[in-house]
UniProtKB/Swiss-Prot annotation:
It holds the Pfam family Frag1. Residues 1, 72-83, 137-150, 205-230 are cytoplasmic. Residues 23-50, 105-115, 172-183 are extracellular. Keywords: Autophagy, Cell membrane, Cytoplasmic vesicle, Endosome, Glycoprotein, Membrane, Transmembrane, Transmembrane helix. One of its GO terms (cellular component) is plasma membrane. Glycans are attached at N29, N33. Its main location: membrane. Signal peptide: none annotated. This is Modulator of macroautophagy TMEM150B. GO terms for biological process: autophagy. It is a multi-pass membrane protein.
Length: 230
């Protein structure tokens, strides 16, 4: 069903528009001063009223991220790929979503350590998740998106990794403005990587989740009459 392809697109649009709206609010009400340098995303969402919008944007984004991660995991399994990598990838996707929610609910001005832990899950673990998805793209058949989707995911994952390293280096050198720019670009890349799942989800029509019940005899499975068409 082609409608599933809208889910990753909705996440990309929602998250991208949301954090830039938060940025606009923080600049317009003077919560951040651009003359001091370009602000980090978290700084823009620290103070009210934009902190309320920031939390809501990231909470909804986290929910959509969980939904997408689970569907992608099941899609890969339905294609006959039962690799451990797929299971680990699901765990990474869920941790990324958890970190995103933590960032939105624990502002750096109140709970800095918790906020940084959430940022690590959202950015670093999120980057690892998409590296795993890049590998799975080459493992799974059929390959949706032709010969382009794999290289695109690879290039975006490389760029994301490089920018995370640069963000940490510039922050260590006290070049906060440049570090913040790197952070914003990383966020945009991660949103784009989520949006690319629309290529895979476009082909979800015809796949089924079967509710199965174990029988008393090992290795025999009785399939129930309940079939969920996605």
């Amino acid at each position: 069903m082609w409608a599933w392809a809208l889910l990753p697109i909705c996440l990309t649009i929602w998250a991208t528009a949301g954090i830039w709206i938060v940025y606009g609010m923080s600049v317009s009400n003077g919560s951040v001063n651009l003359t001091d340098g370009f602000p980090f995303i978290s700084l823009c969402g620290t103070y009210p009223p934009q902190s309320c919008v920031f939390g809501q944007v990231l909470n909804v984004g986290a929910m959509l991220g969980v939904w997408i991660s689970v569907i992608r995991f099941q899609q890969i399994r339905d294609y006959g790929c039962h690799s451990v990598l797929n299971s680990v990838s699901l765990a990474m996707g869920l941790l990324c979503a958890l970190g995103t929610s933590i960032v939105g609910n624990f502002q750096q001005s109140n709970q800095l350590e918790t906020h940084l832990a959430g940022a690590f899950l959202a950015f670093v673990i999120g980057n690892i998740y998409f590296w795993m998805q890049t590998v799975l793209t080459y493992m799974v058949k059929p390959k949706h998106g032709g010969c382009y989707i794999g290289p695109i995911r690879f290039c975006l994952s490389v760029a994301c990794t490089a920018l995370i390293v640069l963000m940490a280096v510039f922050l260590k050198l006290n070049m906060k403005s440049i570090s913040a720019i790197c952070e914003w670009i990383v966020a945009m890349i991660l949103f784009l990587l989520y949006g690319l799942f629309s290529v895979d989800f476009w082909h979800l029509d015809g796949h089924y989740f079967h509710v199965k019940k174990r029988t008393a005899i090992p290795n025999e499975v009785e399939v129930s009459t309940v079939t969920l068409n996605i």
